[in-house]
Regions:
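Vicinal oxygen chelate
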Residues: 1-8, 12-20, 50-54, 63, 65-145, ...
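Core segments of cupin and vicinal oxygen chelate
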Residues: 7-9, 16-59
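Intrinsically disordered, low-complexity N-terminal regions enriched in serine/proline/glycine
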Residues: 9, 40, 76-78, 105
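Long alpha-helical scaffolds
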Residues: 22, 32-35, 83, 90, ...
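A short beta-turn/loop motif at secondary-structure boundaries
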Residues: 43-46, 68, 104-105
């Protein structure tokens, strides 16, 4: 039996978030996106050396910042079943609103929040299939005159 270059359950790209407070970030993701903890390895002083959570069908690796790797965050776009509900859960979990739920010209209803670590979480529900031609038309209509 040969070993696969990408392990079972992983995708070609797996985001890694490193923060001071990995446990708090994991709690936020569980509350907002129903994240499931797949594995977690503890380090000294109640830190997380490495953990993996599953959000929908995608893995996210999380760790506490330390002397080897400092904080590394980013911006993430997640598809969810209900943008409005996820947005409300994010606010209830302490995130700050960046954009309220809105239907976008490209067919997604999305919103974005920023958590206590400065991570931008954009959540979206695809509500309309938009052809390439229609998207171009809508973009031109939105362009400044």
């Amino acid at each position: 039996m040969s070993t696969k270059p990408i392990p079972e359950g992983y995708h070609s790209v797996t985001p890694v978030i490193i923060v001071k407070g990995a446990t708090r970030l994991t709690d936020f993701l569980k509350k907002v996106f129903d994240a499931k903890v797949l594995m977690s390895y503890s380090g000294p002083n109640n830190t997380i050396l490495h953990s993996e959570v599953l959000i929908g069908n995608s893995r996210l690796m999380i760790a506490d910042a330390g002397p080897v790797f400092g904080a590394q965050t980013g911006s993430y776009y997640l598809y969810v079943d209900d943008t409005d509900a996820a947005y409300q859960r994010a606010l209830a979990a302490g995130a700050k609103s960046e954009r309220e739920p809105t239907n976008q010209f490209y067919g997604d209803r999305n919103a974005s929040v920023v958590d206590e670590f400065g991570i931008r979480w954009s959540m979206a529900t695809h509500v309309e299939d938009v052809s390439h031609e229609e998207m171009e038309r809508r973009m031109k209509a939105m362009a400044p005159k």
